[in-house]
Structure formats: C-alpha cells, structure tokens
C-alpha cells in the first residue's frame, strides 16, 4: 500500500520550553534546582498546580493536581505563586531568539512556538538540526544554564510538535518520510497530539487500534465512519506530514475563574471578587474585539457539588457593567446556604464587535463612550487606574492568572503585574 507521505524536506521547527514556569523559577532560585516543585496562581488549600518541575513529574505529580494531593505524594514538594514579569522576560528572550532565524514565528502558547523556515535564506546554508542546537545554546547563554528546550523538526506543524515531545527533556528530533513509519510503530494512539480518550474510543469502535492502522485508513472512511466530519480527512493528511493546522482557531468563549482563599457563603467576600472577575472578562471581550450574547456562572461548592446557571440574551454586550449585571442575576440564584470554594464566569456565543456602529439609544451610546474612555485611561496609565470600588476590593483578593496554554492575554496580564 502506497502511503503517500509528504516527500518535502522539513521546514517547520517546534520549540517547547517544557515545564516552563517551574524551570524559570529554578533558574532564578538555584536552591530549587533538582527539587520537586511547582507553580500555582495563588497558594491556597484548594489551589491547583499549573506547572511542575521535571523532578516533581518523575514522582507522579501532574499539572492540574491540587497542592494537597501533591503533598501526599511528596511531603517535601515546594509550591510557589506565579510571577508573570519573570515569565515574560523568558518569553520575550525566546521570541527574539526565534525571530533571528526567520520572520515567520508563531507562538502557540507562552512556552511553545513555531518557526517556519520555508522561503528563508537561513535554511539554504545551514541544516535545521544545526540551527536547533544553536537555539538551545543561545537560550542558556542569554537566560541561564538551567533552561532547557525541546526542539522538533518536521514537514508540518503536527509532526514538528510530535518530534519535540519524542525525547524529553532537552531533546532535538526530526520526523519525516525517512523515519515516520518506525516512529508510528512505537507509539500509542493517545501519544498523538489531539487524540484524547474520546477520539481513541471512536477509532477503536471503527476497528483502528494502532497508529499504523490509523495511517493506513481510507480518508473517506475516517470522514464518514469515524469522525463524521472533515476532521477525518484532516487527520489523513496530518499524519502524512501535510499541513492542515496553519489556520488560527476561532475564539469560542472568554472568562475567568477564581479559587477562593477560604470557603465562604458571605456576599461581602464573594461579590467584590466576582465583580472584578466580570470586569476582567469584559476586558478580554474588548481585547479580542468581540461581543457576547451568552453568560454562564459556575460554582464549586464545599459539599462537592457543582452548581451553574446560564442565560442567552437577545442582544450582544461587551462592557464591564453589562457583563456584571447579567452575571450578577445568575449568581444571586445560587444556594445561599452552601459555602463556595471556586467561582467561574464565562461569556460565549461570540461575534465580531459591532460597537463602532452608532446606536440610536442615547443610554447605549453613553455606556459605550464611558467604557472606551476608561479603557483609554487604563491603557495609558495602567490597568485599574479607573475602576469600581468593588473591583478594588476584588482585585486585592483575586490574583490574575497566568494564561496557560495561550499567549492571547499575556500582554493584557502584564499591564497589571
């Protein structure tokens, strides 16, 4: 069977600063090197780990695990609160190094990026492997000796990412037509980036149990029988090294969540923080130039229950006041006798903003003009120079979270740091 693998030379390099926040903290604090440690957004009884050092991962401590669970595995586990300016320093250094080799750089997250070498002079005279090793060394020279990155090289974004994860930590590998079949023989379906347990179940139900069987499957079969959408054909191309992932993903929702420092049912503690969450959610809407029609409020209760309410509105909104007004109506319906340990606010059903259109309603115009004026002042002098009194109280309670897995809000976050 002819598999029609992409015959082109690899032109995509994937850079992965794995365990980025934890490694950065170990670089900044030599006493932490070689020790199991992690980073959280705010230290509390219920806080979750957003980054774990290699030493912690080796013990079974994972991202998303609660601090209390990690302590059961390793009583000596060290937890630190996140430090955005520190991570921004490393992020900016990494971006600068990457752009020295090609203008076509795309950061997928704070700790992951892609260099597209197609059409660049650099690749004509030097191998990508040589450039990859040089980038590794430059990061050590320009940031610090403890910094390690994984480098993957491939003909498309997917295979470059797979290659970057092949030999962690500190690996450098290439996947292309010469070694792809042997690589696929040694991995499981869930080792493929994008194939989680639910997709594995679909593949298994269709009689596909190995990556090689996945590779050999007919594209029409994948489309109609397995994924029931064009996603099946995309996987057929992706596995062969053809590019299908160079289109930006559509933004589906924006929001915030907060793990309370202590469980509480007290409105005087909960609502100021909630208003701050709503205000920063409104900022995200405007930052992305979108309006929302739906809003959802979710609460994790001390009893272990999860409570939520959602509402779809006939008209779109984007101002902080409108986000808060709609969300307040929902949170006020919560079971007041139950103590809350975590709050989330989500705006969804997003559409490109129509706020540039002049409204016939004077009150709407006033709200829009006021929001624009406040944003302009805060952009110039720093976030929350102008804000509600409740938000001042709330901001002291809620630490802005590192936008793990995306660079979309990193610039917005640093205005507050």
Give residue ranges: language-model regions.
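Short Gly/Ser/Thr- and Asp/Glu-enriched loop/turn motifs at secondary-structure junctions
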Residues: 108-112, 146, 153-157, 290-294, ...
